[in-house]
Amino acid sequence: MTVALDGDTIRRLRLAHQQLVAPTLTDPAAVVSHLVAMQAQEYAMAKWAIGLRLADGGSDEAVESACDAGRILRLHVLRPTWHFVAAEDIRLVLQVTAKRVHQANAFMYRSLDLDTPRLESFTDLVRGLLAHGNHLTRKEIRAALPSGWVGDKGFDMAYLLMYAELQGVVCSGPRRGNQPTYALLDERAACTPELSDDDALAQFVGRYLRTRGPATVPDLTTWSGLTVSQVKRALTLLGDEVTTVESDGRAYLLADGEPAGDLRSFLMPDYDEYGMAYKDRSAIAHPDHDYWTLPWNRAVVVDGVIAGA
């Protein structure tokens, strides 16, 4: 018999699983690793999102230090959008998501005349430019390329660098003032034991459910960019590690994690995972508001409900 949960319990579980209530972690990189990946196109807001989940409140300096040291990396790994990923997890995440992000980028690759030989040629060039800790900004990389190598369509460099990220060649380097730099991934993140594709997929999906659940299959596919078939395969592999619960006529997936905690009220940063991790936000959004727009507009969360902005 499927267990039924009310809305408050859904919110209590999500708040606890996301370390937004009774957080236990004091290391910024551990928070990022706990959540597998955290959306981070707004850099200052993403640092704040980490701080919300630190048991000691953390500090901007502590998060910056973890990023500069390469313990937290910032690159395009889902959908594609900038995300924070812990260095220890980056190869796992890329193994699961890179192919899907390349597929999402295929139209832009074609539009920018970036065929595979050109993309691979750039990746080889940038590997040489960044070798031996030579961290460069995007502008510096562009200037160092052979004359006429990059077109004038505007997005060329963004997609060239994204390709190199997805191939596991480049990642974020330490910031230089307010400017992000690029570095070689192999110089920033130690190699980790290789997993089979099935093991990597099951681990990735299981960690999402333990840190975001209860969540639906559409929540997971929207957040991760994975296909329904991939998610179903992962659920088969996870077996009884995942249970199905019901709330308001919807089926939710739940994995072992922190027990439901208290409700909490807080100011939520733009693009925070409490809003962005779900396609269906009806369980966390006030019924009087458009929950598709609230989660990235510096929302006010009252007792776990996104109540305004």
Per-segment meaning from a language model:
Residues 68-77, 81, 165-175, 239-247, ...:
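A short, conserved structural fragment
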Residues 1-153, 288, 294:
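Phosphate-backbone binding and catalysis cores of DNA-processing enzymes
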Residues 93-109, 186-207, 211, 264-270, ...:
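Short, amphipathic alpha-helical interaction segments positioned at domain boundaries
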Residues 154-231:
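Loop-centered beta-sheet repeat module
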Residues 63-64, 158-162, 232-239:
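Short, hydrophobic-biased segments on the C-terminal half of alpha helices
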Residues 84-90, 176-195, 250-260:
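Short, cationic-aromatic polyanion-contact patches
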Residues 289-309:
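Glycine-rich, small/acidic residue-mixed loop/short-helix segments
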